[in-house]
Amino acid sequence: MARYLGPKLKLSRREGTDLFLKSGVRAIDTKCKIDNAPGVHGARRGRLSEYGVQLREKQKVRRMYGVLEKQFRNYYKEAARLKGNTGENLLQLLEGRLDNVVYRMGFGATRAEARQLVSHKAILVNGKVVNVPSFKVAANDVVSIREKAKQQARIKAALEVAEQREKPTWIEVDGGKMEGTFKRMPERSDLSADINEQLIVELYSK
């Protein structure tokens, strides 16, 4: 499946929630009727079946983290093999992706921008260039901006935006040095309450 390259707000309207695909503290302004489905007049949302609700939740989380369908299913399979709660394991695997960590640290204004930074070899992990967005970041790994990329205006702008966001407790960032430490995997209570991971587990368990 190809990566979606269309309007980002259209995806958020489809899911009925802010997927944080646009830069800024509040990604969607009041002019975007997020509660309306895509379309000129915003089609009415019909009552979804149980399967439909589960599918929408999966699509919402998949799009939020910018992961393709096959990748997402593989993350679920890995989460199911791990000890503990499968849904929480899934969210931790997604949070541990390098592109997501770069976003959480504020080096990219969006996950898509963070993914570009990784792909363009602007990111170091423990002093070594890593250009794989899905790279698994481990506890105490140090993620930083490569020296020759530190003057990029978009990185500086992203750090300014990040100053206005709530700072993740599982990450420590030095904006001046443009580096951060992934202290630990986030607990479920650290993450968005707007995600119902149990619906995804139920979907894939069928």
From Swiss-Prot:
| UniProt domain S4 RNA-binding: residue ranges | 96-156
Q: Which residues form a coiled coil?
A: none
Pfam families assigned to the protein according to its UniProt record, in alphabetical order: Ribosomal_S4, S4
User: What does the record list as GO biological process?
Assistant: ribosomal small subunit biogenesis; translation
Gene3D superfamilies, from UniProt? Ribosomal Protein S4 Delta 41, Chain A, domain 1 (1.10.1050.10), RNA-binding S4 domain (3.10.290.10)
Superkingdom field:
Bacteria
GO MF, any single term: structural constituent of ribosome
Q: Which UniProt keywords apply?
A: Ribonucleoprotein, Ribosomal protein, RNA-binding, rRNA-binding
GO cellular component terms, alphabetically, are:
small ribosomal subunit
Question: InterPro entries, per this entry?
Answer: Ribosomal_uS4, Ribosomal_uS4_bac-type, Ribosomal_uS4_CS, Ribosomal_uS4_N, S4_RNA-bd, S4_RNA-bd_sf
Q: What does this protein do?
A: One of the primary rRNA binding proteins, it binds directly to 16S rRNA where it nucleates assembly of the body of the 30S subunit. With S5 and S12 plays an important role in translational accuracy.
Spell out the NCBIfam families in the cross-references.
PRK05327.1, rpsD_bact
Share what the entry says about its subunit structure, partners included.
Part of the 30S ribosomal subunit. Contacts protein S5. The interaction surface between S4 and S5 is involved in control of translational fidelity.
Family annotation (HAMAP family):
Ribosomal_uS4_B (MF_01306_B)
Family membership noted in the UniProt record:
Belongs to the universal ribosomal protein uS4 family.
Name of the molecule in the record: Small ribosomal subunit protein uS4
Q: Which organism is it from?
A: Vibrio campbellii (strain ATCC BAA-1116)
